[in-house]
Amino acid sequence: GESMTDQETPERAHVTADDIEAANDLIDFIEACPSMFHTAATIMAELDEAGFTYLPENAAWDIEPGGRYYTQRNTSSVVAFKVGEDLAATWGEDGVAGDYHFQLTASHSDSPTFKVKAVPELDGAGETLRLNTEAYGGMIDYTWFDRPLALAGRVLVREGDRIESRLLATEREVAIIPSLAIHMNRGVNEGFAPNRAVDLCPLISAGDLKQGDFDALIADELDVELEQILGRDLFLVNRQDARIWGWADEFISTPKLDDLACAYTSLQAFLGAENAHDVSVFCCFDNEEVGSETKQGAMSTFLADALRRINGSLGFDDSYHRALAASMLVSCDNAHAVHPNHAEKCDARNQVVLNGGIVIKEAANQHYCTDAFSRAVFQAICDDTDVPTQAFANKSDMAGGSTLGNLSNMQASMHAVDVGLPQLAMHSSYETGGVRDVMYAIRALTAFYERNLTINGAESVEL
């Protein structure tokens, strides 16, 4: 086949010490984020450390130019923003927007996994005890077999007249989904479609635990009484260690690469960039893997509510829609790299490779929000920053996926581009990406935040 774009493939750079440092920092971030609730908590801790002010949604917001703030919803979605010191709500006679606009990135905090049901236990053969789970998102089921599994999420605990949310991440492996031996399933290698209600029930005890023990063990983990537990959102976590590997240190493999790689790189870009003339916004939404149609998802009012409140607190009530028209969103969600054994699954020309640079995704059916205008803006920023880019489009006889850019645009419409890091095995319990692409993404997104865009409709933009 041909190369991934109509441009010549550039000479590949070797992995540098900076690349490895960035990839190791990503691994540390992922290991701190075993659930969407931990992802939000980890992000908010970084924002606190960087001097951001927390603004609860149920409190009044007092926002000033030069300030740095964040809010959260459901303890699983975060919107953070920095107000430029030189922000001004002025428009010229020709209608070109002045300084007041938003430049945003959006990623998501969740990954496909299995959620523990309200009544959590199932008896198994003999004296075994299993967990009663259901699928969260579209995972590759067979990748969950024979892996060390922990539990992570949140538990709602009653303390007198108060109910509070507690984070939980077991420090030990507590479950495994065992394969059926090939001697009992001779046709397994000819094709196996696991039944999630039968084959994918995790084993948690060979006989020492009984019905009712699960919540008691959760109570012990949290050092509370069993009767204090009123609710829980707990998910299975693959406890395989993340690692950088390969003779040339080219690869990073880890659970949850989709989409914590984008959450991490966009957060680092947001924290490291400086722009005195705009409102820079970082978004990390929950529930992308199950459609985003929740109060904390990209399709909710969360982002639009925050932007309106920023606008109102700054005293720019009449300028909100004009600001949106001058704004741009970079939707950050990973992209499919061409598979080494299945090149036929990708478009012959619009295919991408690991360590080839940040991916710009486009689809005629509008499942990605990229158009010629937004592609041109992001491409120019990457060109000026010497960050390589790759063009991705689905093969024309394959449906492909979608992401959160167009969904968030339903509530707050603006120019938008879909980008991501290339990876293999998307929605596996253990995914693989390229080490160099982590730093490429940080550099590209930092440049986006630092470039003060002056957008005139869809006709022109000053970089």
Model-derived features: where do they sit?
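N-terminal hydrophobic/helix-forming segments and targeting peptides
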Residues: G1-L463
